[in-house]
A protein has these predicted regions:
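RNase H-like, Mg2+-dependent phosphodiesterase core
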Residues: 1-214
Length: 214
């Protein structure tokens, strides 16, 4: 079977965006990365793509290799009309809960764009309150809209880079090995080395895990 080109992969996503643009004009795609892990920020990105300078290969970032995501990240940053990346830290997640923290991050990302869009497309099934323009949720939006897919890549790569730096600073937690999810190894390392400020304490409590004296 012939392997599809990047242009062929992205064609349906750009066709979707063209239909949206024909109705609303300028619009932004928004997505997040890192809602589920035990530590680190949730990262949110908003992106307005330039239809005259497409970025081929865009798709749901989870379906792309790390090498491909990195290459797309650089191209999106170069070609996008506007983009904004926001990190929402564990302190905000613990205070507001992960859903509200993510919604707040989405609002910040949209408000931080250099261009004000007429519409915002949000990956998922809900939209943040308080936006000054219409917003629509798009289930599996990162595999439906090129703009949401681009935001997905920006968010995923930004968070991955952040977590790789944490892994270098705190090698004893082996963050790269367990991908910061609630694995047996991860809990054992937390019990041994304690809870650092980058951990989401509300997530540890929800999992019924709270090391005594740590």
């Amino acid at each position: 079977m012939k392997r599809r080109s990047d242009e062929e992969i992205s064609a349906p996503l750009y066709a979707y965006d063209a239909d949206v643009r024909a109705q609303y004009g300028c619009f932004a795609g928004v997505d997040e990365a890192g809602r589920g892990p035990l530590c680190g920020p949730v990262c949110v990105a908003a992106c307005i793509l330039d239809p005259e300078h497409p970025v081929y290969g865009i798709n749901d970032s989870k379906k792309l290799t790390e090498k491909k995501r990195e290459a797309l990240f650089d191209e999106i940053v170069e070609k996008a009309l506007a983009y904004k990346i926001v990190f929402v830290g564990p302190d905000i997640i613990d205070r507001d809960n992960i859903l509200n923290a993510t919604m707040g991050g989405m609002r910040q990302a949209v408000e931080g764009l250099d261009i004000v869009p007429n519409l915002v497309l949000i990956d998922g099934n809900r939209t943040p309150a308080g936006l000054t323009m219409p917003a629509q949720p798009v289930v599996k939006g990162d595999a439906t809209s090129a703009s949401i897919g681009a935001a997905s890549v920006l968010a995923k790569v930004s968070r991955d880079r952040y977590m790789m730096e944490l892994d270098r600073q705190y090698p004893q937690y082996q963050l790269a090995k367990h991908k910061v999810y609630p694995t047996k190894l991860h809990y054992e390392l937390i019990a041994q080395y304690g809870i650092q400020p980058f951990y989401r304490r509300s997530f540890l409590k929800k999992q019924g895990y709270w090391p005594e004296g740590k």
